[in-house]
Amino acid sequence: MRTLFLLRGAPGAGKSTFIRNNNLENYTLSPDMIRTMVQCPVMNTKGEYSISCHNDGYVWNTLMEILERKMQRGETVFIDATHYRAALLNSYNKLIKKYRYRAFIVDFTDIPLEQCLKNNRNRDRYKWVPEETIRKMYACFTYSKEVACKFKIISRDECIKMLDPISCLF
């Protein structure tokens, strides 16, 4: 299908839940998943376990290497990440052109901030994201709309309608 779906929204917006509820795990790359593969949750300064971001360079390089291998085979791929910064969205352009992919942003930025914060509080404790971080990321979506416009932005329902049941056997 040669399609790349970039999920975009604040932590707690429901991106991973969307993937799980639609049985898309086998088609999904997630920096959070790679982070926990590289390092188990660690105790922070507050005495709570959390996922470390100290390996993010390695995590994103690994994600991009796996993505390229999938794109070489023409696979449909979902990236489950916040994509709150323009640089993150732009990092896919080279591969999109090289492998002649269609790319879409699956928009979760319409989820209210309060809902994101509530969902975050209901996560396993080690997966919590500090509320201040969520608020900062949420504010970034307003300022990076112009970059997101380089990609076609689609709703979650539009995304599901686009999936070809023959090429995505789920």
Please report, for each region that a protein language model flagged, where it lies by residue.
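Short, well-ordered coil/turn elements that cap or connect secondary structure elements
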Residues: 23-24, 72, 98-100, 148
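ATP-dependent NMP and nucleoside kinases share a basic, alpha-helical "lid"
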Residues: 37, 41-42, 71, 83-126, ...
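Conserved GTP-binding G-domain of TRAFAC-class P-loop NTPases and closely related GTPase folds
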Residues: 2-8, 13-16, 21, 25-27, ...
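Conserved substrate/cofactor phosphate-moiety recognition/catalytic segment
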Residues: 16-75, 115-117
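Amphipathic alpha-helical transducer elements in NTP-driven molecular machines
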Residues: 53-64, 86, 131-138
